[in-house]
Each structure stands twice: as structure tokens, then as C-alpha cells.
Amino acid sequence: MDRSGFGGMSSPVIRDPEVTRTARKHSAHKRVLIQANQDENFGTTTPRSQIIPRTPSSFRQPFTPPSRSLLRHPDISYIFGTEGRSPRHIQSSGYLGNLSMVTNLDDSNWAAAFSSQRLGFYTNTEHHSMTEDINLSTVMLREDDPGEAASMSMFSDFLQSFLKHSSTTVFDLVEEYENICASQVNILSKIVSRATRWDWQKFSKTASMLWLLQQEMVTWRLLASLYRDRIQSSLEEENMFAIAGINASEKTVVEALFQRDSLVRQSQLVVDWLESIAKDEIGDFSDNIEFYAKSVYWENTLHSLKQRQLLSYIGSTRPLVTELDPDAPIRQKMPLDDLDREDEVRLLKYLFTLIRAGMTEEAQRLCKRCGQAWRAATLEGWKLHHDPNVNGGTELEPVEGNPYRRIWKISCWRMAEDELFNKYERAIYAALSGNLKQLLPVCDTWEDTVWAYFRVMVDSLVEQEIRTSVMTLDETEELPREYMEANWTLEKVFEELQATDKKRVLEENQEHYHVVQKFLILGDIDGLMDEFSKWLSKSRSSLPGHLLRFMTHLILFFRTLGLQTKEEVSIEVLKTYIQLLINEKHTNLIAFYTCHLPQDLAVAQYALFLEGVTECEQRHQCLELAKEADLDVATITKTVVENIRKKDNGEFSHHDLAPSLDTATTEEDRLKIDVIDWLVFDPAQRAEALRQGNAIMRKFLALKKHEAAKEVFVKIPQDSIAEIYNQWEEQGMESPLPAEDDNAIREHLCIRAYLEAHETFNERFKHMNSAPQKPTLLSQATFTEKVAHEHKEKKYEMDHNIWKGHLDALTADVKEKMYNVLLFVDGGWMVDVREDAEEDPERAHQMVLLRKLCLPMLCFLLHTILHSTGQYQECLQLADMVSSERHKLYLVFSKEELRKLLQKLRESSLMLLDQGLDPLGYEIQS
């Protein structure tokens, strides 16, 4: 049946199930074909470097502000977008731009423009693959937060991108940041989409992270757009600003305005940015819009009117419009058919959504698709008038734009003010005419509201410029004064935003990324740093890890551009992020962020991190990474060792005079022992390893932890002293070693002598207590037992002789080693020879205390050995050694210790007297 005649037909609206199924089947088939085609040609989230100019506001022609360096001989192809994009702006920023993402679709398949936007943010340029499905399934089986697990790779991805780009490609870097976020958003969206209602609570964190990464993605997009323009502007000369001629057209005037006025230009960039966000979210209209595909509008009303003309009509006589011109419902104040009214409301809402996304051409296509070509025409009137033939020429060129744009705009303004129209229809024409008051009621989110303000601001500033620069004889009614004379500033926009009565907008205004976006738009880096400081002081530990990553890389971006950031805030952000990386075990990333701290802080921060690294292989890797990041590895490793060895709050204590077992080695002691490993990786640090090892061993010796001290000693490579001398000679130095190194070597040898003496004493002590036992014979032993006893006695005598010989050798050895300590060459044990070294009061104090703690005890032990082996005369010679002015050992003895030493010497003298000798061991002369 020919529907165009409408004769004797039932309602033509697609409400019949069969028709609906058929239509939807056809539509679905077409969408599949379109989607398959677009998957090969379009990324579902448009890379920012490939954004085709949109139509974000009225008075837009295909325009991207060209580089001002080209203004002497302007290339019109840049202005009109016919040859390529401006080198300054990857993203179209022109107030006059009028190209959509899809420019070659006819009216019959307009829906294809949206099929690749099915998931909006939740899409990416990558093709779906079986491998990706498997990876997603694996991620979803992980612990409590699959989103966090899936997005963990972003930390390393961002660092790799940062290291890959130089300062000259900083905007390519920002674009890569955005692409990383987009890829991750794609993954998280798939995870969320597969969540069931039973495990939605588990995936709620993933959904929150998805939103967070979406916001980060668009913030990088905004940053690149604004700062590319700002940097380019700062490099260009002020006197190259474009000025329109006297008889310039509207279009020429506005082009010149965009060239010279950064406020207008950057405000338009904000509008473009907000429209790109809306475009990402817009979805697939082929699924959402349910209009009948005939190019006849208000078809149900038309059908009802046709039916009423028939004499046999018995249906409803409810009042309807009697005419079907576009103004009829308003003029007659009569309604449309209910179904048409529903479709009309739905259509207007989607039209506004398209306008909000800067897709005016798509909105016009939709109007024509739905039979409202007249409405498509009303969306055309914003184009700026330009007659290229005014300046003469051999050939006539077509005139552009609307010569009656002022009348059109006033009509749009009035239409937006008329309460008889639907709120979305009023909002459409409010957006076209710059009527902020009528545009705000349909703006429910922060992005929508900011878009409304900035769109109207640009519209107003452009209109003011046209009014003052374009000569016209038209004396038609003006737009309202408050619109034409508005004094717009970026700060004023956000002040107005703060005063809104919409609760949702106020809440969203406080969200982290919206605060960042606000200060980026304002260009207020100091204000942004103050906000960062507030966040850190208020909730440092609860800030999302990805937000900290963003904050860190934003600061690095500003530094790369040479922009000043508040140093103390930048440092705190970096330190907080580094601590996050430490907590999350991102070991390979820490060095490269630490190197951006001031040197002293970098050393302290990385040393703090290394304290927790215990595996040898991992330690070596961390030092290699520190070298790659140009950190001061030598100072860092020294700091690590000093930090750990100074953690013990134990003090040097006086030894008791009795030989006792070593104090047990604790876990804290084990940390101090192992920390020396940090200094032995690099041979150039052998001198430092020696110094730090000595410091640790001094403390262990004071606490009688000889085994722990020995373990530290073993950690120092045996060739360390030779290595120190070799390195000094390789530097071509003919002078002696530095005093610090010389003294460290001597101290190392002192400790070695003491440990050897102590070890030999312990060995002798154990051997002395392991003497063979003399066999015993029972009183009533048999002959056989007596024979066996004789054999045992012979074996005992043999074993005892061997034992005695070994004991004598050990005794001689321990005597020698103890004398080596007590009579240490060149000034004594633990006494520096070089006095020209840098003063170290703590070390000097410890060495004096060690002499007082160890030497008296060693002297008593030596006396015990000599006395127990009957060497009484040599015992008395200890008095000569202690009192000698050459060695001055008496200075390290306390009065109590000297008294005890004299008591022991008295005992030895008595033993000599018992042997018939004089008190000093000499024969008594008769």
C-alpha cells in the first residue's frame, strides 16, 4: 500500500509487533554491516591526534586557528580545514569549525555515524580477540578488586612512555598518556559489563576505577589542547596578531579575533574538549531512536486529520491541530497526536544531545531523516556571512553564510524564551543564540554546565566583536544588553559555577579531576599546587594510586615545559607517589621518580626504600636502576648502611671481667650484618665498606657479640685493602692514601687481630675442656679386664700427650695473638696513626671506649692462661707491660681493674714462693 496517500489506512505508526520486528531485524542487519565496516576504519574512541573538527557552537565555519607565523601570507586551507590541521592544534579548536567526524554519510545511513560509539568511553581502537577474553577472565577470578589488578600495568606503562619521549615531543607524550588510559578504560569496561548482580559489590570498585580513569583520560586531552596553544602563543611575536580590514566580513573578523585573542581561542578549546567528551559518550542512536523511517513528520496527526475528513469516521474527536506547518501547535495552541508528541519530545532530546556533542551536521541529518527538513534549516542559520567577491576577482565565487544571521539569532533567542516550547527545544535554540538562562535548566552535570557557560561566553565575545567591527546598515532589534555587554572572564565562569543551585553540579565541582580541569583551564598552576597540598595534608594515605600517578606526571609535564611549580608541593607529591610504589612493590619504577627529587632528598628517599630490599639479586638490580636514573649510588648505599646501623639504641657497656659466652645474634643484628652487602657490589666503594664495617663491628665488640662481628668481617672481601691501594694508584696519585682510608685500614687490622685472639682463646678453652678421661680399674678386676685396662692406659697416655701437645700449641698461639692486640704496633690497638683525617667525634669516642672495654679483659684472660699453665714469672711480666710508658696500657684500666690485676699478680707471686723462688720468679740467692 502506498503510505504517501494515507487513504483508508489504519494508523501508520510502527506499533504493530510484526512490523516492529521486521524493521528492527532490518535495522540490526544494517548495523552489523556498518559496525563491521567501521571496525576496520574507525577507532571507537577517537585518538586525539586524529580528531576531525566538530561543530560545537553557532557561527562556526571549517576553521582551525593557523600558526600565526603564517599570517603574512595566510593559507586559507588551514582556516577552512580543507588541506590539513594546524600544526598548533591536533584537535580542532575553531569557533568556526564545521566538519563532523563522519562527513561522507548520506541521509539514508546516518546511523552509521554512531554505531562505532556503542559503548562511548567503553571502547578502544584495539580489536577484540580470544587472547583478550582469556586475559579478562583471568583478571576477573583474582582477589577482591579485579579492576585494580587489571590496571596495575599503567604504572609501568606511564614510566615507559615518559622515558621514551624527549622534551621536544612532550605533547606526543601527553597523547600517549591519553591512549594508555583509553586502552585501560576499554579493558575495565569489559570487566564491568560481565559482572552479574550477585557479584556487583565486588565490581563496584572496578566501576569506580573506570570512572576515575575516564576522567584522567579526558584531563590529559584538555591539557594537550590548552598548553599546545599557550606554548605556541608564548613563542610568537605580539605584532603578528591579525587585524581585520575596514570592510571585513563577519567571518574574516572572527578569524582575526581567534588569532589575536587567547581568551576566545582557549575558551573555544574548552568547548571543543567538552564536546569531545559528550561525543565519546553519545552511544548508538540507531538503537535508541525509534522514529519511523518515512520522511513525513507528525505522521499520526496527519493520519488522524485525514481520517476525520471521511464521512464514515467514528473515532475520537479530541482536539488536534488542524494545520501541519511547523508553527501550527504554537500558533493554534492545539496539541499533536499523543504518539507524535512522544516522538517529538524524544527527537528534541536527541537533537540537543547531538548539539551538546558538537555534531550539528548529524543533528540536521536526523531532522531530515525524520521529515523535519524545516528544523534542519533552523540549525543552519549560525554560519558567518562572507562574500569573497567584494574585493573583486575574475571569477565569481559562492557567497558563504547567512546574511540575515542577526535576525535569525534574535528569533532563536525569542524561541528559547517562549515557555510554550519543549525545554529541549528551547535549549537547542538557547545554545545557538547564546541564551545561558534557558540553556542551564537541561544541564545536569558539571561537564554540561561548564560547556553551557563557555559556549555562551565564546558566543557573546564573538558577537561583541562582530557588532564593533562589521559595518552594517541593518537596524534590526538588538539582542539583550546583558548578553551583548557581558564582561566574561574565565574566573567569572567558575564563580558562577560555584553559586549554582544544582546539588549534583556542586558535588561534582569538588571531585579531584574536575578541580584539576578547572585550574588547567584557568592556567593557575600555583592554585593547582595548593589543591594538591590540601589533598595530601587531608588524606594522603587514602588518595587513589592512579590519582597520585596522574599528579606526579602532571608535575613532570609542567617541569618539562619549564613552567614553575611550587617546589615544596611538587616534592611532597613525588615522595607520596614513591612511597606508594614502594608499598605496591613496583621496585623497577622507584629510581626513575626518585631522581626528580632534590639530590639530598633523592638519596634519603631511595636509601629508605633500599632498607627493605633483602634479596641479593634484587639489591643488585635496584643499584643498576639507580645508576640508570643518574642517582648518587655511592652516597645512597652509604646512607642505607648508616641508617640501619644507627637504629640500635644500645650503648657501649663495660664488660664483666669473667670470660663468658658470646651474646646471641638477634634479627636486628642480622640486618646490620647483611647491610654491608650494599657496599661490596661496587669495587670503588671498598674504602667505604671498610669504614662502615668497622663502625658496625665496633658496636658488636662493645656488646660482646663476637660471632656477629666475625660475620661482618667475613662480608668484607679479602682483597679490599689491596683494592683500595690499587684504585689510589690507578688515579695516578703519588701521595699517601687519604687519612680517612689509612685509618680505616688500620682499624680493620686492629679488629682482625682482636677477633683472631678471641677465636683462638675460645678454641683453646674448648680444647682444654675436652681432655681425654683416664681409665679406671675395678678393685676386683679379672685378668682379662686388667689386660684391657693396660691397653686403655697406653691409649690414654698417647691421647693425653697428643692433647697436651695441641693445648701447648694453642696456648702459645693465643699468647701470641693476645700480645699482638695488647702491644699493637705504632701507637697501640684502636689508635689512629694519621691525625690529619676529618674529625669524627663519635668514632673517636667509640675507639677510646673499646680500648677501655677490651684491653683490660684481654689482659685478665692472658693472665688466666699463663697462671693456669704454670707460667707464673711471665704473669708478673704483665705488670711491666701495663705500666710501660711506651704502650700506656695503664690508662685504659679503671682503679678497680688495676686493683684486681694486682691481686692476680699477687697470686702468681705466691705460687712462685711456693716453688722456692722469690716473688718475681728468680732463684733466691743464699
From Swiss-Prot:
A GO CC annotation recorded here is: nuclear membrane
PTM annotation (Omega-N-methylarginine): residues: R60, R68
The PTM N-acetylmethionine maps to M1
Q: Which UniProt keywords apply?
A: Acetylation, Centromere, Chromosome, Kinetochore, Membrane, Methylation, mRNA transport, Nuclear pore complex, Nucleus, Phosphoprotein, Protein transport, Translocation, Transport
Tell me the subunit arrangement: Part of the nuclear pore complex (NPC). Forms part of the Nup160 subcomplex in the nuclear pore which is composed of NUP160, NUP133, NUP107 and Nup96; this complex plays a role in RNA export and in tethering Nup98 and NUP153 to the nucleus. Does not interact with TPR. Interacts with ZNF106.
Chain segments carrying region Disordered: 1-66
Q: What is the purpose of this protein?
A: Plays a role in the nuclear pore complex (NPC) assembly and/or maintenance. Required for the assembly of peripheral proteins into the NPC. May anchor NUP62 to the NPC. Involved in nephrogenesis.
Compositionally biased residues, Basic residues:
22-32
Where, per the database record, does this protein carry Phosphoserine? Answer: S4, S10, S11, S57, S58, S69, S86
Species this chain originates from: Rattus norvegicus
Q: Which residues carry this modification: Phosphothreonine?
A: T46, T55, T64
Q: What is this protein called?
A: Nuclear pore complex protein Nup107
GO terms assigned for molecular function: structural constituent of nuclear pore
Record PTM text = The N-terminus is blocked.
Q: Where in the cell is it found?
A: Nucleus membrane; Nucleus, Nuclear pore complex; Chromosome, Centromere, Kinetochore
Please give the chief subcellular localization of this protein: nucleus
Which cystines does this chain contain?
none
Which InterPro entries does the record cross-reference, listed alphabetically? Nup84/Nup107
Where is the sequence biased in composition, kind Polar residues?
Answer: 35-49
